[in-house]
A protein has these predicted regions:
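Structural signature of WD-repeat beta-propellers
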Residues: 5-6, 50-51, 94, 101-102, ...
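WD40 beta-propeller blade core
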Residues: 11, 56, 107-108, 145, ...
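A generic tandem-repeat structural signature
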Residues: 1-25, 36
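Extracytoplasmic beta-rich repeat domains
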Residues: 19-43, 68-92, 116-131, 155-173, ...
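Short loop/turn segments that connect beta-strands within beta-propeller blades
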Residues: 14-18, 60-63, 110-113, 148-151, ...
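Loop/turn-rich, solvent-exposed surfaces of beta-rich toroidal or solenoidal domains
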Residues: 134-146, 153-187
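Blade-level signature of beta-propeller repeat domains, shared across WD40, Kelch, NHL, RCC1
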Residues: 201-233
Length: 233
């Protein structure tokens, strides 16, 4: 069991007794965005995006650092200019790790070494959703973007939802589903970016992104509405 705290620490706990097995600590900048990224476990390793713009790979059994690489290094005169938090969900396909930051950076690094493979100047505080061919994200202005995961080149762009505070898009039967601040759930075609449908499922923003289980989508609105539904064109 792995737990991450707001003070830059990551704990590995024994699954049978809950006792601490290892501890990793990182330096937290004086000013950071609220929230932390969720550690991503894959192939015996734990990948974590940190508040200082680093990505670290840990051995999940003992917490030993396999590599640590600074991938988001904003420069500026003020602490706000230098914000480099990696707070969103990451993705892994084969030997590539995909990371996005509110500092307008999305990038790919090699899982074996931490080597930077490419960088794109569009980022998201909520992170990325990854398919075999593309990366999808809703940036800080709620512009939805498709990015080629092999080289970082930009695909389609949707600007219809600007300033609607979109959640991270999630896959649903070949489409993308995401929510907004007004309680709406939106569906778009993942390949073309065509807007397919929308439906109001609450009166406020949602807690996190939609959760997909099989052919059912679950959303939980801050007005207390929990919804399970299916979608078909």
């Amino acid at each position: 069991v792995v737990i991450r705290s707001l003070d830059g620490r990551i704990y590995g706990l024994g699954i049978n007794n809950g006792e601490r097995q290892w501890l990793f600590s990182s330096e937290v900048p004086n000013l950071t965005l609220r929230g932390t990224s969720t550690p991503l476990a894959k192939g015996g390793r734990l990948y974590v995006g940190l508040d200082n713009g680093d990505v670290v790979a840990l051995n999940i059994m003992d917490g030993v650092v396999m590599w640590q690489q600074n991938v988001v290094n904003n420069q500026g005169k003020t602490e706000i200019d230098r914000l480099s938090d990696i707070d969103g969900d990451m993705g892994v396909v084969a030997t590539d790790l995909y990371v996005s930051s509110a500092a307008n950076k999305t990038l790919a690094v090699a899982t074996e070494s931490g080597q930077l493979l490419w960088r794109n100047n569009h980022g998201s505080s909520s992170g990325v959703t990854v398919s075999r061919r593309f990366i999808y994200l809703a940036d800080n202005n709620s512009v939805v973007r498709q990015i080629d995961r092999s080289n970082g080149e930009l695909g389609w762009v949707i600007e219809d939802f600007i300033n609607r505070e979109l959640s991270r898009p999630v896959f649903y039967l070949g489409d993308l589903v995401f929510t907004d601040l007004a309680g709406y759930v939106h569906v778009i075609d993942a390949f073309t970016g065509k807007i397919l449908n929308r439906k109001q499922m609450g009166k406020n923003h949602f807690f996190g992104s939609p959760v997909v289980d099989g052919n059912i989508i679950y959303t939980y609105n801050k007005d207390g509405t929990l919804t399970a539904f299916r979608y078909s064109e």
